[in-house]
Design a protein with these regions (language model features):
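Acidic, small/polar-enriched beta strand-loop surface segments
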Residues: 2-4, 179-299, 304-310, 322-325, ...
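Short amphipathic beta-strand and strand-loop transition segments with alternating hydrophobic
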Residues: 19-29, 69-76, 301-304
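Cys-His-centered catalytic/binding microenvironment captured across papain-like cysteine peptidases
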Residues: 89-92, 104-110, 321-340
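Extracytoplasmic/secreted envelope proteins and their assembly/folding machinery
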Residues: 109-113, 148-151, 206-207, 254, ...
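Oligomerization/assembly interface segments of phage tail-like spikes and tubes
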Residues: 26-44, 79-91, 209, 259, ...
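Solvent-exposed edge beta-strands and adjacent loop segments
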Residues: 1-31, 186-200
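Surface-exposed cap/loop segments at beta↔alpha junctions
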Residues: 45-126
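Short beta-strand-centered interaction patches in the first periplasmic/extracellular domains
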Residues: 72-93, 127-204, 208, 213, ...
């Protein structure tokens, strides 16, 4: 696999040589991060491509474009080198701004169309809802933000995942995301390093939701109570009620409750595998933790791949219904606790 570099003006494009293959990594975090990091030395054979590597130049990996956002040039004696961080081109959405705002009952597609009406960079989007689970929710002054910020709001509001193919963006409900594989990860067997946090403090099996109230104080729909089938195993454990006036139908509230309820032990962890492993974004794998007798699916929500070496990837696995931001905060706290 070749890495290509082009200048900001896209006048020149060269194959990148002279980079340290052990330094080259691809980091992806669901809905949050996608970047390349690498180290490259300047030599007589790569002077042209080395000079192409600059702030805002492009790096191409497997057909995807990444933009150099951080570049550190250094010299030790006669050795000149650069440390490069390039983020996926979809992050350039943040350079456009939607000044206008919309309100009322809106679908995810309407919100996305409103966002990209302000796009000046050639982004396109597709919303795929094969099981028709998405419904309108009430928006109030949606807009007045950069496009990336507004997309993040839509992902959270409508419980979506975004998949980027350069500037072609696909949005799907979180329930439809990820391939269920037959791969198994067994604690202390398939890993050299494992750091799993298994938490039943947040385990709940029932939740009630309240939606919009009209000007006369009447509910648009009666409160919705969802009881998980897992209650037959764990008993009825009541989660704090959810109240959100953006919801005007019981069916849309029911979907939200099912996605909010943490009805199985929350599992989040980092692992380093013993062997090279081709992991896909959002893949589900079977997690086996024999000390607690646990056997259930967890999802790949982040990875760090070392593409040009045989070093296995580092994976973050989770079945936690928290957002990735919450997950990363949780992991950071766990790491700090371990250091003390």
């Amino acid at each position: 696999m070749d890495i290509f570099v082009s200048d900001y003006e896209k006048q020149y494009k060269e194959i990148l040589t002279g980079f340290d293959p052990t330094s080259f990594s691809e980091t992806w975090v669901e809905n949050q991060q996608w970047q390349l990091d690498f180290y490259v030395e300047k030599t007589r054979n790569n002077q042209d491509v080395f000079d192409l590597l600059n702030h805002e130049s492009s790096v191409y990996l497997d057909g995807q474009e990444f933009i150099v956002k951080q570049l550190k040039r250094s010299a030790v004696g006669k050795i000149v080198y650069s440390e490069v961080t390039a983020t996926h081109i979809y992050f350039t959405m943040q350079d456009d701004y939607q000044y206008n705002a919309i309100s009322g009952s809106k679908s995810a597609k309407e919100c996305l169309a409103h966002i990209f009406a302000a796009d000046k960079q050639g982004f396109s989007f597709e919303l795929i809802d094969k099981n028709k689970v998405l419904e309108n929710i009430t928006q109030e002054n949606f807009g007045n933000g950069n496009l990336l910020k507004l997309v993040q709001e839509v992902l959270e509001d409508y419980k979506l995942v975004m998949l980027a193919d350069n500037k072609r963006l696909t949005f799907i409900p979180i329930e439809d995301y990820g391939e269920h594989t037959e791969n198994e990860i067994r604690y202390n067997k398939h890993t050299n390093e494992v750091d799993f946090d298994i938490d039943t403090l947040s385990l709940k099996t029932q939740i009630k939701g309240y939606g919009k109230v009209d000007s006369n104080g009447n509910n648009y729909f009666p409160p919705v109570t969802y009881t998980s089938p897992e209650s037959s195993k764990w008993g009825v454990r009541i989660q704090e009620p959810l109240s959100d006036e953006r919801y005007t139908t019981s069916s849309s509230m029911l979907r939200r409750l099912k996605l909010e309820l943490q009805d199985y032990p929350a599992t989040t962890g980092n692992i380093s595998l013993k062997l090279k492993y081709e992991c896909g974004k959002g893949d589900y794998v079977m997690f086996v933790y024999e000390p607690l007798g646990l056997l259930y699916e967890v999802q790949i929500v982040a990875y760090k791949k070392y593409i040009f070496t045989n070093k296995p990837p580092e994976l973050t696995l989770s079945n936690n219904k928290k957002t990735m931001v919450s997950i990363m905060v949780q992991l950071a706290k766990a790491i700090k606790k371990g250091v003390k």
